[in-house]
């Protein structure tokens, strides 16, 4: 983080860090144009899903499931190798191409609403259980 902060020490980039308060976090995400998650180790990031739901253009590494969540145009996926150099290339592009940034934000929001809401996940889990019950005979 400090290397990137030194490269982008101006008003174009706000280095916020962790925000525990949910209302503040939502307000920040709704104002943000880009959300960056440069994790080297990750599962499925709730912060990434929150940013996507807020309509931020999202950039994350392919650590854990984050790359899968952003695949297919819902965001930009980076390798966990050479994150700093990748961000040095990507951040100016996202800053200078507002149409691209806005479209990535729209695609991110669409993806999270299509696949990652609680009701969608409950429906999918119920479907899975139903499929399993129809296939497997019950033991006596």
Regions found by a protein language model. Name each.
Residues 57-60:
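Short hydrophobic beta-strand element within catalytic cores of glycosyltransferases
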Residues 40:
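Aromatic "clamp/platform" in nucleotide-sugar-dependent glycosyltransferases that forms part
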Residues 26, 45, 49-53, 67-68:
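Short alpha-helical segment that forms part of, or immediately flanks, the ligand-binding pocket
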Residues 100-115, 121-127:
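A short, well-ordered alpha-helix in the C-terminal region of glycosyltransferases
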Residues 1-20:
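Nucleotide-activated donor-binding/catalytic signature segment of Leloir-type glycosyltransferases, i.e.
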Residues 27-32:
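Short alpha-helical donor nucleotide-sugar binding micro-motif in glycosyltransferases
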